[in-house]
């Protein structure tokens, strides 16, 4: 069986950082200008620099991200998107700096981080030409698409621009027209996209209430900037994203910039000046000359999120393995390998490699050395270190792909490992010679383990029917044999330590569950625990035995029991596995346990241990009964050891091998596992491993025709300039975007985030009356039986009506604030007192208590679907039904069932 506990895979550590000039500033994001100054985001904070370049000065300092600054038309105020109070909201500050003013109070969006594919919520887009209002994009009513809103610069209730959806935008000089995008794809890691969501630039006329597509191009045409009679925008119609210009008089489009290495990113304009990102630098361009000029910027920063720090290794454990004597553990945590005592002693970090990802450490069964995987060379290789310490020995060299995992032979002489090329390799520890035993065209050999005599391997491989088949491999013959057939999916095989059985899980229990909506079925919990009797001479442990035993036989049994127990230990140490393949598929017996999902097997021939039904269990083959060993805990056993390692929650426990329910006792002390995290080295490693992950795992070897080595070189030069994890994620996202592949995302990792403070929502549309109180314009109808699909104002007994006024919240008159939602900050799901009145006054108001919603998207979506059902029903005279399926996951299936069956009368 696997002799380690695998908790999760963590991609960590790094390659040496590239050198950089001390005063050079790069990865400068989201620039804006007033013509004289440029404000940009660097490491999540806003900085200001003269438009001619020079030393930048920090304007903000906060754990959250400040981004998308936009100067007011008079150049005196900066509007920006920030996370000061937890939510991503719109703020303003004087151009000279100072305390930010919060302008909006909207809903907490669970998907509004900078690295999310939908982008941040409440992105500041522009100002109205008169400088009175700020335009921003909000996703309060739609988790994916956004709508454009305006808000007064001093704050207040926002007003929607009458467009169904919107993104980046820019007003015409007279303010009567708006050039805008409908879609927001700027944060997706998918370049060169030409599908149905490829954006165009549209012009909306507020006077005529018309829209016009001015690009109508299959490529991405985004971020319009209206200057005089020209609209500048980005397009990747020539592959690399560059600036183009459309003349509103001649209707002609021309290319302006001609960058070929890096895309032009996130331009903005003010007056006649355009500023933009390219390759992490900021450029400016006069709209008249149309000649870009790099702005040389220097800055100094404490780089607080890139500084080294000490982390508790116990929070990052990915694997643990018990020494054969049961006295020490080797634990992998955050890419480091620790050797620590089970009870008392010294905890040692035996790798100390912040620039490498070390993992899967295991003790050798003889207890003399430790083997682990590391990518210190830039490729994953196997390493060995003496258990008492000393130099690391590299066991494999010049590996060409990712090593998935490995297993040591019980005699400690060999290591079997698998890789991303679906090879199963055998390493001779003494000679370091590697032999490829097989390469599977369908997928990797899974769960490879040795027989107790080190002469056989067992594993599963995927058959042509997509079912997994159990195999054994004879190392002397260099030949594999199937042990199960194609008719049932089987997994997780291990040899019993006495060499008599092969224990595995198999899906052979067919107990369908039938649906309530139609005569259909689904199969769950199909797996059971099975034994293959390897030798013809091995009887089934479930043969019925005669209960009548003579006194003489019973006495003889007592006299020989001690000898049998003594000789059993010797047999286990020298168990020779004998396999008769003739009729082997007919020598399969099932343990009488409830069907479920099983794995992590261990058997000494008398008992079978396994994970299943929420914990570790044991089946006694002699007593023929099952006992719970440890609920919620998984178990790992070393060959020949009397000790076992349990993992439960975040704790590790070591006990004797239990015969029944285990007493876990006190957990192992993990508090001395301290890791010195060097973020620059760690981030360099993460970048490199991300690149290798696509090199080794992309579905096409030609990488969509991309020179993947050149792509790495192109973006690797940016990595030393990363000062936050979000910077690194952006670089990796740009790199994988070159593959022009959908659903290729970056796991955000450890991102510094402020605590979210959820704003309570009412499931209603409101306006501000001239009295200063807030009027209920519309209460969204919903499903009365669902709390998430109804407005709290529709709760029976509250009887709120459209046209009524909310005159106070928790005792605070609403006419005393600019935005009523400022009184609902932190009130999501919290009982809240509101005063309702048919008149805009406190006198005569009635008191009621509601629990505001956390989000309104579900309610808006529900109303949208209901409206569409009514429209289709009316247009077809009741003959056609309407179903909206949001995705192909559980929610999509639920929505189909929810709306399909009730409309079978259509």
Say what each PLM segment does.
Residues 22, 41-47, 61-66, 79-91, ...:
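A flexible loop/linker signature enriched in serine peptidases of the S9 family
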Residues 32-35, 69-77, 125-133, 169-177, ...:
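Blade-terminus and WD-like Trp-Asp/Gly-His loop motifs, strongest in beta-propeller folds
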Residues 666-739, 743, 785:
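Terminal targeting/pro-maturation regions of precursor/exported proteins
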Residues 22-28, 54-56, 301-317, 577-594:
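A short helix->beta-strand "capping" segment at the edge of beta-propeller domains
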Residues 757-816, 890:
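PDZ/PDZ-like domain segments forming the peptide/carboxylate-binding groove
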Residues 786-793, 807, 812-906:
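Cleft-lining beta-strand/loop regions that shape enzyme active-site pockets
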Residues 720-775, 842-850, 854-862, 866:
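Extended, small/polar residue-biased N-terminal targeting/export presequences
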Residues 22-49, 316-335, 592-609, 613:
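Beta-strand-rich domains and repeat architectures in extracellular enzymes and scaffolds
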């Amino acid at each position: 069986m696997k002799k380690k506990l695998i908790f999760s895979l963590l991609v960590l550590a790094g390659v040496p950082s590239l050198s950089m000039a001390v005063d050079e500033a790069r990865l400068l994001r989201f620039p804006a200008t007033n013509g004289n100054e440029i404000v940009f985001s660097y490491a999540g904070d806003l900085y200001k620099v003269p438009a001619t370049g020079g030393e930048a000065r920090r304007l903000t300092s906060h754990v959250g991200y400040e981004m998308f600054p936009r100067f007011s038309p008079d150049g005196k105020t900066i509007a920006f998107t920030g996370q000061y109070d937890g939510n991503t909201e719109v703020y303003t500050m004087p151009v000279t700096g100072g305390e930010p003013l919060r302008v909006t109070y909207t809903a907490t969006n669970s998907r509004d981080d900078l690295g999310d594919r939908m982008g941040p919520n409440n992105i500041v887009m522009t100002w109205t030409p008169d400088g009175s209002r700020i335009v921003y994009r909000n996703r309060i009513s739609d988790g994916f698409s956004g709508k454009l809103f305006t808000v007064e610069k001093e704050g207040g209730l926002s007003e929607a621009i009458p467009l169904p959806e919107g993104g980046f935008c820019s007003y015409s000089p007279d303010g009567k027209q708006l050039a805008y995008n409908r879609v927001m794809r700027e944060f997706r890691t998918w370049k060169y996209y030409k599908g149905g969501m490829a954006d165009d630039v549209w012009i909306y006329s507020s006077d005529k209430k018309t829209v016009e597509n001015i690009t109508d191009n299959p490529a991405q045409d985004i971020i319009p900037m209206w200057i005089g009679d020209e609209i500048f925008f980005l397009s990747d119609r020539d592959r690399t994203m560059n600036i183009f210009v459309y003349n509103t008089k001649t209707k002609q489009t021309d290319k302006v910039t001609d960058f070929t290495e890096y895309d032009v990113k996130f331009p903005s304009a003010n007056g006649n000046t355009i500023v933009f990102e390219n390759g992490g630098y900021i450029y400016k361009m006069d709209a008249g000359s149309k000649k870009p000029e790099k702005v040389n910027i220097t800055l100094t920063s404490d780089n607080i999120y890139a500084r080294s720090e000490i982390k508790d290794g116990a929070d990052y454990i990915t694997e643990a393995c018990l020494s054969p004597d049961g006295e020490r553990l080797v634990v992998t945590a955050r890419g480091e390998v620790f050797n620590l005592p089970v009870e008392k002693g010294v905890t040692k970090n035996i790798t100390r490699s912040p620039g490498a990802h070390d993992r899967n450490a295991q003790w050798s069964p003889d207890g003399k050395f430790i083997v682990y995987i590391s990518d210190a060379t830039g490729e994953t290789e196997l390493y060995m270190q003496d258990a008492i310490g000393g130099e690391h020995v590299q066991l494999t060299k010049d590996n060409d792909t990712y090593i998935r995992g490995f297993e040591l032979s019980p005699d400690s002489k060999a290591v079997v490992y698998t890789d991303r090329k679906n090879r199963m390799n055998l390493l001779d520890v003494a000679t370091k010679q590697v032999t490829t035993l097989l390469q599977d065209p369908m997928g990797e050999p899974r769960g490879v383990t040795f027989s107790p005599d080190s002469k056989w391997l067992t594993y599963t491989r995927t058959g042509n029917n997509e079912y997994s088949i159990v195999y054994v491999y004879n190392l002397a013959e260099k030949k594999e044999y199937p042990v199960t057939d194609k008719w049932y999916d089987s997994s997780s095989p291990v040899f019993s330590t006495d060499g008599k059985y092969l224990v595995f899980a198999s899906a052979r229990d067919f107990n369908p569950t039938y649906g309530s909506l139609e005569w259909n079925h689904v199969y769950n919990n199909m797996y059971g625990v099975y034994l293959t009797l390897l030798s013809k001479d091995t009887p089934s442990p479930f043969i019925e035995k005669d209960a009548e035993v003579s006194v003489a036989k019973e006495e003889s049994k007592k006299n020989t029991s001690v000898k049998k127990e003594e000789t059993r230990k010797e047999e286990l140490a020298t168990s020779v596995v004998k396999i008769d393949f003739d009729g082997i598929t007919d020598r399969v017996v099932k343990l009488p346990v409830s069907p479920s999902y099983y794995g992590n097997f261990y058997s000494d021939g008398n008992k079978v241990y396994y994970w299943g039904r929420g914990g570790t269990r044991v089946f006694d083959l002699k007593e023929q009964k099952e006992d719970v060993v440890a609920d919620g805990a998984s178990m790992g056993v070393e060959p020949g050891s009397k000790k076992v390692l349990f993992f439960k929650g975040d704790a590790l426990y070591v006990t004797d091998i239990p015969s029944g329910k285990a007493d876990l006792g006190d957990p192992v002390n993990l508090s001395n596992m301290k890791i010195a995290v060097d973020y620059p080295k760690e981030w360099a490693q993460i970048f490199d491993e991300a690149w290798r992950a696509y090199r080794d795992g992309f579905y096409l070897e030609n990488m969509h025709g991309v020179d993947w080595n050149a792509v790495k070189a192109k973006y690797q030069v940016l990595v030393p300039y990363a000062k936050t994890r979000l910077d690194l994620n952006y670089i990796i996202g740009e790199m994988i975007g070159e593959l022009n592949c959908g659903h290729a995302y970056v796991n955000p990792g450890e991102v510094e985030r402020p605590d979210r403070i959820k704003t309570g929502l009412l499931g209603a549309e409101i306006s501000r009356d001239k009295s200063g109180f807030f009027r209920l314009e519309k209460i969204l109808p919903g499903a009365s039986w669902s709390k998430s699909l109804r407005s709290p104002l529709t709760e029976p007994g509250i009887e709120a009506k459209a046209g009524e006024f909310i005159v106070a919240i928790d005792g605070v008159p609403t006419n005393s604030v600019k935005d009523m939602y400022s009184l609902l900050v932190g009130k999501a799901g919290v009982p809240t007192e509101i005063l309702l009145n048919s008149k805009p006054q406190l006198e005569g108001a009635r008191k009621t208590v509601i629990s505001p919603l956390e989000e309104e998207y579900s309610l808006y979506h529900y109303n949208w679907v209901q409206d569409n059902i009514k429209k289709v029903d009316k247009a077809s005279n009741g003959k056609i039904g309407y179903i909206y399926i949001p995705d192909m996951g559980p929610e999509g299936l639920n929505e189909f069932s929810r709306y399909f069956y009730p409309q079978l009368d259509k």
